[in-house]
Amino acid sequence: MPQAVRFEEYGGIDVLQVVEVPQPVPGPGQVLVRVKAAGINPGEAKIREGLLHARWPAVFPSGEGTDLAGIVAGTGSGVTGFSAGDEVIGYTDNRASHAEYVVVEAGHLATKPAGVPWEVAGALPVAGFTAYAAVRAVALAPGDTVTVSGAAGGVGSIAVQLARRAGATVIGLAGEANHGWLAGHGVIPVAYGDGVAGRIRRAADRVDAFIDTFGGDYVQLALELGVKPARVDTIVSFDAVQRYGVKAEGNAAGASASVLAELAGLIAAGQLEVPIAAVFPLAKVQDAYRRLERGHIRGKVVLVP
């Protein structure tokens, strides 16, 4: 029987188990995918801990995972455009991709370009959708200056590149270990910590937009820098929407097969990098989350069944 990650109750990393499950069967309009790689995301840890129960409650036993890349193993009735053996990138809304096999809606899949490595493809969907939506939300145009917090993380590392492609000057807030990577991608790196507002002001004469992928006080920082609330997007501080009138457009706002295909095409063309911080086998899912939750990583942590 195939294996999948499950948890029976809310809790820490130790509630995650890899167990045998029945082989999933695709229904009408669905595709069975043999998973080759699946990214893990901070929001999945928060769901497992019960911190997002009011927004996204778990039903036990619960699976995990949204991102996936793999090989089509079968299709349900009515599916066109995909057949057994096709290499695909996709996403599932059913928290089920941290597994050897997953059933996915056909409309949630895009063809994986041949030159894109499995671990990169499997890391792309949630971070890519979120970054895409955030850049779109702040309406960047050539000549704008945007600051991105968490600029070397899974979402931030993609957002800074998409912002550069939009013609913006990009200031990236990150730990000093990641400043070289940011500078190499045309981003002005700025260190966290006391005095960050002054360092940002010295880096650029104005800030027109702000993308917060980190949380904490960064929405307030954006407003302190004079950014209009309509051009601030946070993917973390959801309460700031009501409090300050900022935006909170992320994964759901960007999720589509067409966006996935566009981003995968940029990767294949060498115009977008998805940094991979670490790769773990499915059986080491607990270790994968420990690496994620230590923080200060560049890019994504990925499981390979």
Regions found by a protein language model. Give the residues of each.
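Short, well-ordered loop/turn sites that connect or cap secondary structure elements
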Residues: 82-83, 140, 226
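C-terminal hydrophobic helical "lid"/dimerization subdomain
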Residues: 34, 260-305
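A glycine-/small-residue-rich N-terminal strand-loop-strand element
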Residues: 69-93
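N-terminal glycine-rich beta->alpha transition that marks the start or flank
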Residues: 12-15, 21-69
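Mid-domain Rossmann-like dinucleotide-binding core that forms the NAD(H)/NADP(H) cofactor-binding site
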Residues: 124-193
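Rossmann-fold dehydrogenase core element
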Residues: 229-275
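Glycine-rich cofactor phosphate-binding loops and adjacent beta1-alpha1 units
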Residues: 171, 183-249
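NAD(P)H dinucleotide-binding glycine-rich loop of Rossmann-like/cofactor-binding domains
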Residues: 57, 74, 89-150
